[in-house]
Amino acid sequence: MSSLEQLLYGISQLFLGPVLLAVLILFGYAFHALGAFLMQAHQRSRARRLGSLEGHELLLAHARDTSLTDDELEALALKRMERARIVSRVAPMLGLVATMIPMGPALQSLADGQFADMSRSLTVAFSAVILALIAAAITYATVHVRRRWYAQDLLAVQRKRTGDVQP
């Protein structure tokens, strides 16, 4: 292996620990986001039965400050979804990186006939990508449902402003 190849290999191996840590953090965050989402879904369901605004963040924000424009409410919605949107996009990338980094040592172990080392490297690689994809799937789903909720809330605010009351 040339010195340039060794340098590239060495640098890539330095990223394994931080990337695995990032995948674990994103995985944990995804379940935090799922819990917050389920709580909001419960609040919205209960609010529908009771006729309150609980769980309807944009409607609550508008009720507190009726001078908020549609653009400001939309910015609030985007801010509320931002972290989960980032996780849904970054987690698969980090999962791919976490898969590729151990592949080099796994292939080297295969070439050297060290099947136990190869197995360990592949276990790390595939475990990381699985966790990353689960994190991405959870956050993707929560973002898309919230996007619909916020669109409904914005529509309700617009109807309220124009006096058009629809069910």
Per-region residue spans from a language model:
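Membrane-cytosol interface motif
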Residues: 47-62, 153-167
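Helix-boundary and loop/linker segments of multi-pass membrane transporters
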Residues: 74-78
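Hydrophobic alpha-helical transmembrane segments of small proteolipidic membrane proteins, enriched
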Residues: 1-59, 79-150
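Conserved signal-transmission helix
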Residues: 65-71
